[in-house]
Amino acid sequence: CRTVGRGKPGAETPANPPQKPARGGPPKPPRTLGRAASRSPKRIVAFVVTGALAVAAVLIGAEVLRVSGDTIEQGDLAAFYVQPDGDVPTEPGTLVRSEQLLGTPIGSQAWRILYSSTDLDGAPVLVSGVVIVPDGKAPADGRTVLAWGHPTTGTDPSCAPSRAFDPFIGIEGMRLMLDRGYAVVATDYLGMGVTTAEGVQAGKDSYLVGETAARSMLDSVRAAQQIDPVEAGDDVVLWGHSQGGQAALFAAQEAPSYAPELTIAAVAVAAPAADLTKLMGSHLDDISGVTIGSYAFPAFAEVYASVPGADLSSILTPAAIEKVPQMNSLCLMSSLTELHDIGQPLIGEFTLHDPTTAEPWATLLRDNSAGGKGIDAPLFVAQGSADELVLPADTAAFVAHEESIGIEVHAVTVPGASHGTIAYESLPELERWLEQHVPTNGGP
């Protein structure tokens, strides 16, 4: 495991990577050309300031246009996510609905999408997400596709990242990937985003259900390939953070059998929820465990309803069963204080038994932990030394396991990075690693 320096955030939000350092050595001394050399310092400063203001005006204008587009799109947002009448296509990855977005990042086009996938029982389901592609010509064999797995945002349909006012802000490294010429697709995962005509969740909740999340990611790539301007090829980079790290790892494991036409060129994860047994065991008696459990146990009880004993009354206390529906309806980022206010009294009173040892929960946690199958691609794993949710020791154990079964792993530890910042702070190292394993597509 390599320890690297922390990434230095630039002027942009953490959804965008730092700027590349200038190449070609130290700057050359300025040349003196004719009358330019006689300009006074004041005139030079005025020229520079005027130029800077002009650039700023362009950037501000572009941002105002983007925000205006976001505002317009919110008006008809709910209608887009209503599941259409009729049967869901049985072919996984079928694009069912798309809508070009107005408020897009500079130098790109984007679409909101609904597409078909498959749940754990093999039934066709609808999933939502977004696709972003840089301006410019794609290679003859199509663009590399970066499939992003988002960290926990909640489980209610309203918590889907693509439904947010700015659906791009949470995609860590999006600007970096667009500049590399990649198409970027970000799934919401099954159970989020899409609703019935009555406004309730369409499809089973799938929080931390690894195989279902994997299918959501892989099928998002297939859907992106059906939008002609995206010009998406078959080469795929999987990149995920926390819950999304688990999704990316499972997608890499399942791709050979579920989506054999796709080539997984590289897999990158930041503080992945790779070992659910250790994750849950580390937080049984704190607010993180209660919050994660309020999302995970209802999802498992719904998805594994046919498994004997996999009902909430077998694992949660009566007090927890009373409060979990309310917690389960709240989104993590927008309702964190409320979630903690509800969950705090449940600390130490949340579960009847230790789910890491009590069946069938112990088996379900193991089955949804990554590492059960190999990955036929190089693997990048980033971990923050100050992460108090996914513990550094647990990630180190996962890395050791992957290396023991012959997987090529590049593991880095970022000093001082927390669980919330590790995906962003690892971007400089991730870019260097991608340079070695996945070529750029030219960029905008």
Residue positions per predicted region:
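Primarily recognizes the serine-hydrolase "nucleophile elbow" in alpha/beta-hydrolase
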Residues: 222-290
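Alpha/beta-hydrolase active-site loop
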Residues: 206-228
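C-terminal catalytic histidine-bearing segment of alpha/beta-hydrolase fold enzymes
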Residues: 353, 357, 362-363, 389-444
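Catalytic-loop region of hydrolases
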Residues: 41-138, 403
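Short beta-strand/loop motif that positions the catalytic acidic residue
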Residues: 375, 380-387
